[in-house]
């Protein structure tokens, strides 16, 4: 005799524990200079994301960092998707939300060597895993018809990230309202 209800309950509990474990694996480290659109301090995972926060703030763009995606995507293998940046703006009197993902890859789609070292896997495995994640995120946006803007580490090497963001945002219809030095100074977090 097999008690399917007990097994199903155990399975649900294990799924929920796995989701919590997956979301806990992300290591938040660096504080951004400016708050998000709600006035809350932002803690990011890389210096490049920190610079993106600075650029978005200086361009007068309203955003939140790692806010849950508007569609439920959590499953046995994934915690709920949290795009790097959710960008909010008004268009025709309606609040719009688009997304910005920053991918830590070079112009060839390769991750830095330390990605593998930090996870104790081979460089090939690190590239495969990271690029699978990129593909999964892009597919989610395509499936639900949400707009995704993308930057990468290569953008920091081959262009000015602020100029790149200004161009991407303008193409997406996001109004730019550049902050003065005084306005930025007033926003600086302690």
Residue ranges of each PLM-predicted region?
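A basic/glycine-biased coupling hinge at the interface between accessory DNA-binding modules
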Residues: 1-15, 19, 154-190
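Acidic-and-aromatic substrate-binding clefts and catalytic sites of carbohydrate-active enzymes
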Residues: 70-80, 153-160
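Interdomain/boundary linker segments immediately adjacent to catalytic/signaling cores
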Residues: 1-43
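Nuclease catalytic cores
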Residues: 41-53
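Short beta-strand-loop-alpha-helix junction that forms the active-site gateway
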Residues: 82-134
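A short acidic/basic microdomain associated with nuclease active sites
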Residues: 57-77
């Amino acid at each position: 005799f097999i008690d399917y209800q007990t097994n199903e309950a155990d399975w649900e509990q294990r799924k929920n524990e796995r989701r919590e474990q997956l979301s806990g694996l992300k290591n938040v480290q660096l504080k951004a200079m400016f708050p998000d659109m709600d006035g809350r301090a932002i803690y990011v995972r890389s210096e490049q994301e920190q610079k993106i926060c600075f650029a978005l703030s200086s361009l007068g763009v309203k955003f939140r960092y790692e806010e849950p995606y508007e569609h439920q995507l959590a499953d046995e293998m994934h915690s709920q998707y949290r795009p790097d940046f959710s960008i909010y703006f008004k268009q025709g009197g309606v609040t719009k939300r688009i997304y910005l993902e920053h991918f830590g890859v070079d112009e060839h789609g390769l991750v830095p060597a330390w990605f593998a070292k930090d996870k104790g896997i081979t460089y090939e495995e690190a590239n495969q895993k990271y690029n699978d994640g990129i593909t999964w995120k892009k597919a989610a946006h395509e499936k639900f018809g949400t707009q995704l803007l993308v930057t990468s580490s290569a953008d920091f090497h081959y262009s000015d990230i602020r100029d790149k963001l200004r161009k991407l945002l303008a193409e997406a219809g996001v109004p730019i309202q550049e902050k003065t030095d005084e306005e930025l100074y007033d926003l600086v977090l302690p």
